[in-house]
């Protein structure tokens, strides 16, 4: 009998969209599957993905991921034309799609990709319903983060 591979903690994450949390208030998160081609899976296994500028469009009752860039590997396939920025279908159930439609129709809301990761053998994308931040919101978040770091540093030094 074969042994299971040892799971490396933290190795399931393929790509993060850190800018999304900086530029948007994330109100609700959903987990969606991705309809991928073979060369895309190979690229994801190699960690060659970028979702920094990606967002989700809902049309004709389906969700589509725009702007995600999966860099094709040179040895992936010679007979298939690889389009790194093609739109990819998101696999969501109808209840989740209806919830997204209801939230997006409100003024100022959008859906952005937050992270791309492996769940068992399946590639999943975490998407979030987001509302854009104003400049002063970004500044206050930065101040809060700096204060938390300073506070932790003070507490660490106070114990000495």
UniProtKB/Swiss-Prot annotation:
Role according to the record: Required for rescue of stalled ribosomes mediated by trans-translation. Binds to transfer-messenger RNA (tmRNA), required for stable association of tmRNA with ribosomes. tmRNA and SmpB together mimic tRNA shape, replacing the anticodon stem-loop with SmpB. tmRNA is encoded by the ssrA gene; the 2 termini fold to resemble tRNA(Ala) and it encodes a 'tag peptide', a short internal open reading frame. During trans-translation Ala-aminoacylated tmRNA acts like a tRNA, entering the A-site of stalled ribosomes, displacing the stalled mRNA.
Record-linked InterPro entries: SmpB (IPR023620), SsrA-bd_prot (IPR000037), SsrA-bd_prot_CS (IPR020081)
Species the sequence originates in: Salmonella typhimurium (strain LT2 / SGSC1412 / ATCC 700720)
Pfam family, one: SmpB
Family: Belongs to the SmpB family.
Official protein name in the record: SsrA-binding protein
Keywords: Cytoplasm, RNA-binding
MF annotations from Gene Ontology: RNA binding
GO biological process: trans-translation
Cellular compartment(s): Cytoplasm
SUPFAM superfamilies: Small protein B (SmpB)
Coiled coil: none
GO cellular component: cytosol
Null allele phenotype: Decreases expression of genes encoding virulence proteins. Not essential, it has a diminished capacity to survive in murine macrophages. Decreases virulence in mouse.
């Amino acid at each position: 009998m074969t042994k299971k591979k040892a799971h490396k903690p933290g190795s399931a994450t393929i790509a993060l969209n850190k800018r999304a949390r900086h530029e948007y208030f994330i109100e609700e998160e959903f987990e969606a599957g991705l309809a991928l081609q073979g060369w895309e899976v190979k690229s994801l296994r190699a960690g060659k993905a970028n979702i920094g500028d990606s967002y989700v469009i809902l049309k004709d009752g389906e969700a589509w991921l725009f702007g995600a860039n999966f860099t094709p590997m040179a040895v992936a396939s010679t007979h298939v034309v690889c389009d790194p920025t093609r739109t990819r279908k998101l696999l969501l159930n109808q209840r989740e799609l209806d919830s997204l439609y209801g939230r997006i129709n409100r003024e100022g809301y959008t859906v952005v990709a937050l992270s791309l990761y492996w769940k068992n053998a399946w590639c999943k994308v975490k998407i979030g319903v987001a509302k854009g931040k104003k400049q002063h919101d970004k500044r206050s978040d930065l101040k809060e983060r700096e204060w938390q770091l300073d506070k932790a540093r003070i507490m660490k030094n106070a114990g000495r």
